[in-house]
Amino acid sequence: HVLLVGAGAERFARIMGCEEGDLETELSKKVYQAFIDDAFDDEGVIDESQNWVVKYARSQNLREWFDKLADEHHGTVNIMALDANGDIASAVSTSGTALKFPGRLGDSPIIGAGNYCDNRYGAAACTGRGELAIRNSTARTIIHYLENGLNPEEAAFLAMKDIHDLNGVGGMNCIVLDNKGNTISATTTPERDSVYWYFDVDMTEAEQRAGINVQK
């Protein structure tokens, strides 16, 4: 099997002993409630870190869609590993984009878009506007760049340049691991620092490392 969804995926996760959890946070619930109440402009409701949600909701006219649907019903985690045998794994979890249309599928479960790994070359995973990664097959493209002799930073740089070339709405981030254990992260978002966490067998705790910011 390559892809499991819905009840089957939930059943498999339980069999594998995965812990169930609530993806909602107090902040995400506060922002969502502000959207429901049309209270983005109320003082103290939205802090600066969530301004992107307000901009997105307004630019995409989500209030109109919400009023039509009236259906009451946040981040992505990327993990990659290289073991002593040279086996490489990548995993992505996501709660999807905020205020999405029912049925919308992002890049995380799409092998080649949101994540990809190949023992011969390395692994890559993405977070950001999933539609952009799907259009570019970003994770697979990064591995293709590694296959053609680029190092992780060069591969990440070109992949983020490819995202800019789409001229789409939203940004993209990625992390890259090659088959030698070299790592890097990258982002297309101007106001964001690209960082990731690294850990190996010689370390007692994980360390935060700086990635690169790629602009047009």
Regions found by a protein language model. Name each.
Residues H1-K216:
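N-terminal nucleophile
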